[in-house]
């Protein structure tokens, strides 16, 4: 029996690799002779770098860069030498996990460090750069990253703008003369799981600003500032992309990557699946098991189980989901290739307990699934 194990990470609990290992351990109890193929997955957010580098036998590199609030951080990024491809997970340099909850500041946080990672990839001769842009602490429209790459932003008095999205309200003009010329020879791809525009009620500031520390007044100010930034970008760049799906991803980094770098926007799970060879692995399999921390209606928006189920469906392979919790609307996934879904806790349990005991719970649930499958096969 050939089983593909392709889960995402369980946030604040286990990495995708840890989830896959626990599921494999449970299946092995019942099917010791089964061919278990572990394909840890991600959707452009947390774990994307790790999943791609591990599956591609790439190199994990480290770079000291400027963090979201100006502090120096050691960020990891991936290098696939054979294809001269760099994997940059922006959360490594500009992520929410780098800022304690009490210090989160959507108004002044910057993506400058992400730009520094791009520059490091250019120094190594990258021909393709994949930007995984989930989990950001920033709301600067990607301005900081572009400044790190040579874009100059000035106010009316010819002073360089300080970091952060709020400062963009004072932008008077953009100078592209110092933009790194190597960028023109690189193919950029954005791997993300959101398709919001830059501005408006569904834009970066309104939807994601509050979780980054913005109050209602600041959300309004940031939205206006990003709109002002987009107005000026439209004057010096060939295309206005503010309303394109994904421009609001990562506090507007999606906008800057599209506008300045010509980046192609792709569903994060699609990019990861391609690089880890999921389609080839699923072909001929008897079962696919995937999962994530919370499985609900939001999964339909390009989350890992959705992407995995679509691939399995194309090959007629059944899919079972194991999730930390089953939320509202998860049943909708039954129309998109999922055959069954199970939550981890077998009884009342706190979130903290479920997270700490996730390996054991995953192993038990996987073993239970295998026993039911085996029993059904005997009939």
Residue ranges and their predicted role:
Residues 1-133, 137-379:
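N-terminal loops that bind phosphate or other acidic moieties
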């Amino acid at each position: 029996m050939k089983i593909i194990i392709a889960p995402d990470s369980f946030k604040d609990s286990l990495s995708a690799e840890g989830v896959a290992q626990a599921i494999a351990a449970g299946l092995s109890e019942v099917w010791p002779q089964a061919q278990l193929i572990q394909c840890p997955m991600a959707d452009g957010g947390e774990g994307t770098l790790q999943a791609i580098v591990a599956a591609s036998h790439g190199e994990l590199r480290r770079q000291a860069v400027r963090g979201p609030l100006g502090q120096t951080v050691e960020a990891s990024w991936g290098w696939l030498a054979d294809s001269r491809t760099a994997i940059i997970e922006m959360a490594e340099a500009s992520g929410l996990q780098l800022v304690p909850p009490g210090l989160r500041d959507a108004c002044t946080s910057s993506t400058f460090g992400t730009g520094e990672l791009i520059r490091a990839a250019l120094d190594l001769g990258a021909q393709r750069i994949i930007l995984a842009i989930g989990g950001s602490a920033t709301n600067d429209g990607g301005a900081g990253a572009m400044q790190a790459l040579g874009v100059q932003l000035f106010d009316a008095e010819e002073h360089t703008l300080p970091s952060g999205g709020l400062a963009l309200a004072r932008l008077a003009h953009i100078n592209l003369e110092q933009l790194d010329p190597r960028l023109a020879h690189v193919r950029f791809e954005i791997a993300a799981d959101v398709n919001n525009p830059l501005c408006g009620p569904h834009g970066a500031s309104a939807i994601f600003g509050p979780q980054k520390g913005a109050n209602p007044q600041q959300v309004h100010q940031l939205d206006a500032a990003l709109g002002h930034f987009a107005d000026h970008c439209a004057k010096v760049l060939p295309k206005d992309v503010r309303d394109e799906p994904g421009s609001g991803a990562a506090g507007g980094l999606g906008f800057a990557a599209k506008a300045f770098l010509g980046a192609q926007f792709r569903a994060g799970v699609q990019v990861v699946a391609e690089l880890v060879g999921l389609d080839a692995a699923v072909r001929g399999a008897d079962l696919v098991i995937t999962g994530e921390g919370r499985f609900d209606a939001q999964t339909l928006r390009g989350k890992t189980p959705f992407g995995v189920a679509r691939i399995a469906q194309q090959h007629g392979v059944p899919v079972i989901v194991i999730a930390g919790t089953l939320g509202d609307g998860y049943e909708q996934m039954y129309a998109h290739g999922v055959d069954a879904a199970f939550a981890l806790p077998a009884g009342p349990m706190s979130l903290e307990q479920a997270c700490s005991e996730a390996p054991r719970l995953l192993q038990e649930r996987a073993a239970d699934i295998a026993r039911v499958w085996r029993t059904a096969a005997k009939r």
